[in-house]
Amino acid sequence: MASQMNPELPSPTGNGRSSAASWEQFEQSKMLELIRSLPEPKAYHHEELSAIRRQAAELRTRISQYQHALQRPIQHENKHYHITALGGAICRLKIILWRMFPFNNLPVEIVVNIFRFAVWSTINSPEGILLRFHLTWVCRRWRHIAIHDQTLWNTIWFKDVKLGYQRSKLYFERAGTATLDLRIEDDDNSRLIPGQPMTADDMTRILDILMIKSNQIRMLIVVVELWPPLLVLLDRLHRSSRTLHQLERIEIHRTGRPYRWDGPDYPLCDYEHALSLCNGQTQRINYICLNGIHLDWNRSCLTNLTNLDLRRMPPDLGPSLDRFRYMLESSPNLRKLSLDGAGPIVPMDSYARPYPPVFLPRLESLALGDFLVTYAIFYAGIIHAPNIREITLLNLVGEDHAQLFKVMTGKFPELLMLTLFSVKIRKGLENGRIMVPWLLSIPKIKFIRMAGMEPDMLDLFYVDGRFHIRNDIPLNLATEMKQAILANGSPITICPELEAIEVQQIDINSVVRFVSDRKRLEVPLRNLYIHLNSFNAMTPDETAILQTQKYEPNFVYVTVPMRLTPIEESIWKQVRGG
C-alpha cells in the first residue's frame, strides 16, 4: 500500500490530494459509528423499503452537490466542511445499500464465495482468523454455511498456545478432508511465559495433532527460535514422509542463534548428523524456504522447484556446488531464487576452473545479500537467466561492489525492477565505465528502489551513454574527441523507460535533483516513492524542500514497509498477463 504525501483531509473526491490510508481510516471509523447507532438488521416491509430508497436518492443528490462544491474555489474552512460532509454521506449511503440488499436470498454457492473472498482479503493473518469466527456469529444460516465449508477453515495458524491450541484444533476439525495450509509460529507475544521459547515437547504436542491428517498437508510454515523444536520437526517429517503426498510448500525459519547447535540444551546424542528433508520423498514440493537451518543436502530430493529461498547458513554448511547446480538444473520452472546469507559452498578453485552457467529460462526474480560481494559475483556467474524481471541486492560485504555489476552487464536485458540496499560504488572514472554500461544493458527498467546509499549512484543517470557504448573510448577525453562524439547522433539516455523510484535513507536534495533532471532530459518520472521510515525521520527542512517543489498531484507517495508499491503490482500484473 502507498499513500499520497501531505493529505489535506480524508477524502474520496479524486482531487489528487487525498490519502488512501487516511480515507480508509476515516471510512472505517465513520461506518462503525453509524452501524453502532442503528438497530439490529431485519427484513424490511415494502413501505420501509420505499422510504429507504428515497433516503438513498437524497444522499446521492447531496453527494453530487458536495462534489460540485469542491470543484469550485472555496475557502479552506468551507472546504474542510464539504470534505467531511461528503465522506459522511458516502458512508451513510453505503450502509443503507448494504442493509437493503437481500443477501440471504443468494444461492449458497455464491454466499460461500463471498465468505471466502472476505476472509482471504484481510490485511493480516490474525484478522482473517477472527473473521471466520465472526461469520458464524451473525445468524443460524451464516453459521451453517460457514461451518460446512471446509475450505474456509483449511488455513490454520498454530499460535494460540495461551488457549491450549483449542482454536486451532477447532479449525483443524472443521477443515475436514480439505487440503491444509498450516503455520506454526512461536514469538514472545504469544508465549505462555514471555522469554521462554517453544521447546521440543511443545513441538511434539503440535505435531501429534497435525500428523493425524499428514496426507492432507499442502503447505507448512514453521517459525521458531531454537534448534530443539526444529530437530523434532525434521525428525517427524522424516518418519512421516510416506504420507506427505500433497506437501507442495515448506518454509522452516529458525530465528535464534547460534547457527550450529551446541551446549547442554541441544541433544546431539539424538541428532548427530544433519537430517534430510522428508527422507528425500519430496517430489511434489516446489516451494522451499530454509532460514537458519541446513540439511543433509545429498539425501534431500530438491528438484522441480519454482521457489528456492536459502537464508542465514554458515558458508561450509550449504549444499556443495555440484549439488546446488543439480538442484537448479532439475528445476527448469524455477521462478524465484533467493540467497540471503546462504548459498552453495564456493570451491577453492572456483576462479581457476570454469563452471558453465545453468540455464534458467523461467527465472523471474533473483535476490543476493548478506555475504561477501565475491560470493555474489560467483553466484551471479553460475546462472544464465535472460528473462529475469526483478533483482534485489542487499547488504553485501565489501568496500566496492562495482565488479558485481560488471559480471551482470548484458545478462538481464528484460529486467524491469531493481532493488539496491547499501550497495557501495566507489566514485571514479573506472567505476563509471562499469556502471554506465550496466545501466545501458537494462533499457527496460521501470522501477528502482534504493536504500542506505550514497547519492553518487543517482549521478550515473545524467551521463550521456554515447561516452560509454564502447570500451575503447578513453576515460579522459581530449576536447576534439568529445566534440566529435557529441556531434555524432542524439544523446543516449540512461534507462529511458524508468517510471518511478523509491528512496530510503538517501539525501533528499539529491533525490529532488534527480527528479528535476529526469524531467529536463525529457524522460520524467511518473512517481516518487518515499519509504515510511524515511518519511517519518525527515527533518522539517527536508520536508520543506519537498513541499516547495510543487510536484503534480499524486506524484509523491509514502510507501508502507513490506508492501509492493502500486507500480510493482502493475508490472507483475503485466508480466503475468493479468
Identify what each model region corresponds to:
Residues 2-578:
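Leucine-rich repeat
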